[in-house]
Amino acid sequence: MSESRITYKDAGVDIDAGNTFVKMIKPLVKATSRPEVIADIGGFGGLFSLNSSKYKNPVLVSGTDGVGTKLKIAFLANRHDTIGIDLVAMCVNDIIVQGAEPLFFLDYLATAKLDPEKGASIIKGVSEGCIQAGCALIGGETAEMPGFYSGDEYDMAGFAVGVVDRDKIIDGSSITVGNRLIGIASSGLHSNGYSLARKIIFDKMGLGIDDIIPGLDKTVADELLTPTRIYVRSILNLLRDFPINGIAHITGGGLLENIPRILPNGCKALVHKNSWQPPPIYQILQNAGNIEENELFRTFNCGIGMVLAVPEKEADEVLIRLSGLNEHAFVIGEIAKCEAGSECVEMI
């Protein structure tokens, strides 16, 4: 009696499903293409021809990120078509703050069992994010890992590469005392603080994924799955006409941890807490979770997705331009002299 043969599919990896998935996402990938893209997806590497004639001394800027436990909300709601926007946003927003135009993007998707339909829904979001950012999706990796992830769960990571002329790199070194801090509004929680938000909403408040959040006209799923705002086009527009001395992407660590990343020695940020109105979700989370104010500002973006440091004389014109770009923006503070031993960011 001969032993029965075993296949890769028997072990939980379906190559045919993978091939079906690739065919399904090709139009989504094509929709993001730029003239510099040389080859279609499916090769061993993505090819992108940098037009160096556009730059005096081009510097490539790279970033990688994920979306954290916001994925848990997507699993509970069984909604997967916007989480890819978050993935792109977290990466391209990190490189635009250095003045770099995002050029191309790659994604990594790992799951226990590949569902081509669900996978295509995820990549639909990645494609939309790339279109918003103006960068090309030139490749990715889909890993089917049976026994590694539970049930229908998956994880994602993204990788973005951009370019900036060396003399136009924004690193905060030109920030000076008197610069104004302009905050650009976020679209919600973006992709940070979800472990705390989930604990409060599900454990403390006892809500379900489809329940209306008290005080809001939105369900938990609608509020928490609001896509992260992509600021690339607006900031590139500003950089063409205004001197921007520093930009901070307000992600994990909130205002208190991210603004210091761009401050030169001898400078501190004075942030006026009453200069903008955070969306109601933050007050709801603070009250329900009994969160101290300092913890709130170092966990969530509190309604501010980007902070720009600009010369005082340019602040009003920058606000006008941002309004014309459909961004809600506010002067939220200024740069002051930092005395030895004092905090880099003061919330006043």
From Swiss-Prot:
Annotated GO biological process: 'de novo' IMP biosynthetic process; adenine biosynthetic process
The family this protein is said to belong to: Belongs to the AIR synthase family.
Keywords, sorted A to Z: ATP-binding, Cytoplasm, Ligase, Nucleotide-binding, Purine biosynthesis
One Pfam assignment: AIRS_C
Predominant location category: cytoplasm
Source domain of life: Bacteria
Enzymatic reactions: 2-formamido-N(1)-(5-O-phospho-beta-D-ribosyl)acetamidine + ATP = 5-amino-1-(5-phospho-beta-D-ribosyl)imidazole + ADP + phosphate + H(+)
Lineage: Bacteria, Pseudomonadati, Thermodesulfobacteriota, Desulfuromonadia, Geobacterales
Record localization: Cytoplasm
Gene name linked to the record: purM
Pathway(s) of this molecule: Purine metabolism; IMP biosynthesis via de novo pathway; 5-amino-1-(5-phospho-D-ribosyl)imidazole from N(2)-formyl-N(1)-(5-phospho-D-ribosyl)glycinamide: step 2/2
Protein name: Phosphoribosylformylglycinamidine cyclo-ligase
GO cellular component: cytosol
Disulfide bonds: none
GO MF annotations, alphabetized: ATP binding; phosphoribosylamine-glycine ligase activity; phosphoribosylformylglycinamidine cyclo-ligase activity
